[in-house]
């Protein structure tokens, strides 16, 4: 195999950078690591909330001034750019959260790209089934195992937090399945149980923490149960180091998601050594199994309807979700999720054994360093192909 010299490579990495979204974190991690390896990286910063600290924002903006030669490949690392245009190769680095099927307009955009990069085989299978003509390659995401580890310290939590803590970290929205999780926790546990549920979440639209608190209260009241264990809401913006300390302050990570493109919170929690409870669907199914996690099976699949006014409907939250297949979780799923949480709470030896398997996998095979190396290998192949065309 020909040795790759990163200093001979250049790339325009386009997407959000300055928020705490998954794409923003991905772009920061890759841009910084590629640059440190010698790749000339120009950060094409798309508009987003500025949630990172001043130092990080300055580092990103410095990369936005990098000079790159004509014909440099552009990598759009986002759901989908409004315009796909470049004098060199055009690469879409994207992911979708549906279980089956992809939106027609989404696939049509794919066919405008020189290549499509996706983080898991779940997404590559969806593209293949949809008949996308552009070449598709796996370029994974990862975790910073130096930040997210079992020795990252423990965040102090409110006095209402009990000794045993379930944790869920994600944006607030129907796709993330907080309705399922909250109902399962409330119905399964009682005030006499030394347990609590910690929810670390913020609203995508910028609504205050009080909005999420009222949403949680509404879900709790819908169960009709009075004797219940406490729920603790953590909604302030945190750095990665603070987030790692939050993981380490808790005992089990739970994500009852209806669909993931990758799920950085799962791999970050696993890197910190937490047992994981999740859903058996979409991207997380490519690295979670019964040996390393507790998995909730869907009861079936249904089309996302943008006209569905239910709070749990994902159809109205993304243009590309319309009429695509997402898992169905109802009362049976709520009961089963509660059972899985109870199992991890009472049989801690089994939970620890599952966690050890997943932690080893994440910390050795699912790191940002590995993801960066794969990115460089693919970028080198694209650049070589471009040179051949010019000859």
Model-found features: residue ranges?
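Acidic anion/phosphate-binding donor-loop and adjacent secondary structure
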Residues: 104-105, 143-161
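A short, well-ordered alpha-helix in the C-terminal region of glycosyltransferases
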Residues: 336, 342-343, 350-364
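Extended catalytic core of nucleotide-activated donor transferases of GT-like folds
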Residues: 2, 12, 49-130, 242
């Amino acid at each position: 195999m020909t040795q790759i010299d990163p200093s001979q490579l250049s790339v325009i990495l386009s997407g959000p950078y300055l928020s705490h979204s998954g794409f923003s974190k991905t772009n920061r991690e890759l841009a910084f690591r590629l640059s440190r390896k010698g790749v000339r990286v120009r950060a094409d910063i798309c508009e987003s909330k500025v949630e990172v600290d001043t130092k990080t924002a300055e580092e990103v903006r410095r990369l936005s001034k990098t000079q790159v030669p004509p014909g440099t490949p552009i990598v759009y690392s986002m759901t989908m750019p409004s315009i796909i245009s470049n004098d060199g190769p055009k690469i879409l680095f994207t992911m979708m959260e549906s279980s089956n099927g992809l939106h027609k307009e989404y696939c049509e955009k794919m066919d405008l790209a020189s290549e499509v990069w996706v983080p898991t085989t779940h997404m590559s299978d969806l593209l293949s089934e949809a008949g996308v003509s552009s070449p598709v390659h796996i370029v994974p995401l990862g975790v910073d195992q130096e930040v997210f580890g079992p020795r990252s310290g423990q965040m102090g939590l409110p006095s209402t937090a009990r000794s045993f803590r379930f944790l869920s970290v994600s944006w607030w929205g129907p796709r993330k399945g907080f309705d399922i999780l909250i109902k399962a926790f409330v119905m399964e546990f009682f005030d006499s149980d030394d347990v609590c549920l910690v929810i670390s979440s913020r609203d995508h639209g910028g609504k205050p923490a009080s909005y999420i608190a009222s949403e949680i209260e509404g879900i709790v009241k819908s169960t009709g149960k009075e004797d219940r264990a406490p729920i603790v809401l953590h909604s302030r913006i945190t750095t990665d180091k603070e987030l790692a300390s939050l993981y380490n302050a808790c005992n089990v990570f739970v994500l009852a998601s209806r669909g993931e493109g990758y799920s950085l919170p799962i791999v970050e929690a696993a890197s910190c050594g937490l047992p994981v409870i999740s859903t058996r669907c979409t991207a997380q199914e490519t690295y979670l199994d019964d040996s390393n996690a507790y998995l909730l099976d869907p009861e079936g699949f249904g089309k996302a309807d943008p006209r569905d006014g239910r709070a749990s409907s994902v159809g109205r939250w993304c243009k590309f979700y319309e009429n695509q297949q997402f898992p169905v979780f109802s009362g049976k799923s709520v009961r089963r999720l509660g059972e899985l949480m109870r199992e991890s709470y009472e049989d801690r030896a089994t939970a620890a054994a599952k966690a050890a398997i997943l932690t080893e996998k994440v910390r050795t095979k699912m790191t940002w360093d590995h993801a960066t190396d794969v990115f460089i290998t693919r970028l080198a192949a694209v650049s070589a192909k471009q040179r051949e065309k010019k000859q």
